[in-house]
């Protein structure tokens, strides 16, 4: 296989995470990186042996030896940088969420389609052991007729910056576009829509909240203006319904895991239990399907992100 040469735009927290995965993919080489922070760019590029470094991502896009770029920037920058990359004749792998608004997301998709370029959004939950097994069970008819899905995940205290981790850029609308729903919710919603067969949406309602106390100094210094809690209800044209609960902070114990309800059985997924799929009332077929799907590589922490990258490549 010919060597695939790519560039990475943004070497912050997410960019470093992606670079760690790239070194394990044979036939791939990161030849260029771009970031406004030149000191950090130099440090990261030296660590990963990236020869070409740019403070202006447009210079990176001028390289004709790069076939694809990985966009690892703040949410509201995804659209302009992705579209610029597509216009520069590059395929794009972009960190989630796709964009800060539906309008921007649609512009990205239209640019990719009109240019016949691949646009892949990092949604690692679509590649987990739980998702693959659940999809197998659903497609086999083991759970019967689907009628409801639950997309949920919340932390007792896990607000970026104000609760002690991450930067303030996660909690500023002008940079991140949204809070828990954009940061965590996209993973669970994408997973649920996939399991339900990507149904046509009829109506969506929802509400966002910012109710819990936080350190006043951190609130002031961060400019915190996004939601910590979001809830929604989705009606589909075929009668399916989905409820959504996402929270960075809530006065309940931490919990994460979506569920699917059918006329013959139900499936609950919990990624923090390392590929233990909870299945109720499905019987022998379900047990056999789960056992058949298990593989040592699937159990590795971060394997879902690796599969997402490999899928793009």
What do these predicted ranges mean?
Residues 190-281:
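Contiguous beta-strand/loop segments that form the cofactor/metal-binding neighborhood of enzyme cores
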Residues 118, 125-224:
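Predominantly a Rossmann-like dinucleotide-binding segment in NAD(P)-dependent oxidoreductases
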Residues 25, 48, 63-64, 128, ...:
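Acidic-histidine catalytic/liganding microenvironments
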Residues 18, 48-111:
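Beta-loop-alpha module in the N-terminal Rossmann-like domain of NAD(P)-dependent dehydrogenases
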Residues 54, 94, 119-121, 244, ...:
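Hydrophobic residues in well-ordered beta-strands that form the structural core
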Residues 254, 258-261, 268, 283-313:
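C-terminal helical cap and adjacent loop that interface with cofactors, partners, or active-site loops
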Residues 1-48:
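N-terminal Rossmann-like dinucleotide-binding module
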